């Protein structure tokens, strides 16, 4: 018996939110043969639910490691604090950066997010395809109801330039700051998440919970953000 960890965007599904029939068949076959299949993703719970997968999974790691669910039961959750969220929001507003909160109940976007994220969403979904016309949206998007929250798994902000990311690293000493944006190491967005949290951390925690040796683990990913998934299994 093995336990499989699958990244979502770019691995299980493509950047247009489509799941190949081969991927679906592989997941079903793996579970039929007695293996565990878990998602290991930066997505929060509502994003995963909005995918409407028509096959079963054993659970998932969300928020790049700050949320773990097994067979519908939450076994770990460490969101950002209210103070951290306020710091992030005020910083983004001071720099006129569009931002969002990724919570288990949905993705709450700033009022200017849809307008300022058009190019980032186009590049994320279509790369350099000049024939693409409409920027895709996310069914998990919600109107922001509060600028400050205590249930945020991680944040994201649209990069006007790479300097925004570098400045964020200096600004948020009590959070993990990263970038993401599709294939490889393309940086379209910056993000912040709780300190001490990573996909590696969560995989180790889940393996301990299930009493499974790391030698029985297999991880699948497509970008540099998935490299931490490999650390517990090598």
Regions found by a protein language model. Name each.
Residues 10, 65, 221-223:
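Active-site metal-binding loops of divalent metal-dependent hydrolases
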Residues 18-124:
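Active-site phosphate-binding/coordination module
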Residues 106-220, 224-232:
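Conserved acidic, metal-coordinating active-site core of Asp-based
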Residues 2, 58, 234:
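Conserved acidic residues
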Residues 4-6, 60-61, 219:
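Residue-level marker for buried hydrophobic side chains located in beta-strands
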Residues 12, 69-72, 186-189:
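A short acidic, helix-capping loop that chelates divalent metal ions and anchors anionic groups
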Residues 2, 35, 97, 210, ...:
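Short coil/turn segments at beta-strand junctions that form active-site/ligand-binding loops
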Residues 2-17, 39, 88, 230:
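Asp-based phosphoryl-transfer active-site loop
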């Amino acid at each position: 018996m093995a336990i499989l960890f699958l990244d979502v965007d770019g691995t299980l599904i493509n950047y247009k939110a489509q799941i190949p029939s081969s991927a679906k068949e592989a997941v079903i076959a793996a579970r039929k043969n007695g293996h565990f299949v878990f998602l290991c993703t930066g997505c929060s719970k509502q994003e995963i639910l909005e995918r409407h997968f028509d096959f079963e999974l054993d659970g998932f790691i969300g928020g790049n490691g700050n949320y773990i669910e097994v067979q519908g039961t939450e076994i770990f959750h460490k969101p950002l604090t209210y103070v951290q969220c306020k710091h992030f929001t005020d910083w983004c507003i001071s720099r006129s950066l569009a931002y969002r909160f990724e919570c288990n109940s949905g993705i709450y976007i700033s009022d200017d997010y849809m307008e300022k994220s058009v190019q980032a969403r186009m590049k994320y979904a279509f790369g350099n395809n000049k024939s693409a016309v409409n920027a895709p949206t996310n069914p998990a998007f919600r109107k922001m109801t509060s600028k400050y929250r205590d249930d945020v798994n991680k944040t994201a902000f649209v990069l006007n330039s790479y300097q925004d990311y570098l400045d964020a690293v200096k600004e948020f000493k009590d959070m993990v700051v990263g970038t993401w944006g599709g294939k490889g190491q393309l940086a379209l967005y910056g993000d912040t998440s709780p300190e001490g949290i990573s996909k590696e951390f969560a995989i180790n925690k889940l393996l301990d919970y299930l009493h499974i040796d790391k030698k029985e683990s297999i991880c699948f990913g497509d970008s540099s953000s998935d490299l931490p998934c490999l650390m517990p299994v090598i």
